Amino acid sequence: MYCTGLTNIKISDSITSINAATFFDCDRLTSVTIPEGVTNIGKSAFEDCHSLTSVTIPSSVINMDHASFYSCSKLKDISFTGTKAQWRAIIKNSKWKEFEVTYTIHCTDGDLEE
């Protein structure tokens, strides 16, 4: 684990993709803001971030790879900058999230539970 002191992240506006396992096992990470313009969240990008409670995902995201937020057991609320229809249109690969946890996705036109 290389990010032992990392507690929150605001990813640079110049980033368009979060690569596989970029923040894997950042156990103290509590919040993430992904900027508009990011289109892909890679495999296991935030897997095993056990303290993660807050994430903002932009409407520009079109793909969330396998296990992108898997085993983030404290993550219950996701802020999404697009509509419910845009959220549903995102390609979410298997096990993108922890299956035992119910998430609330806060969209611009209302909330979804998954």
Where are these regions (language model features)?
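Structural signature of tandem-repeat unit edges
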Residues: Y2-S17, D27-N40, H50-N63, S73-A89, ...
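Acidic/polar low-complexity surface segments
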Residues: Q86-E98
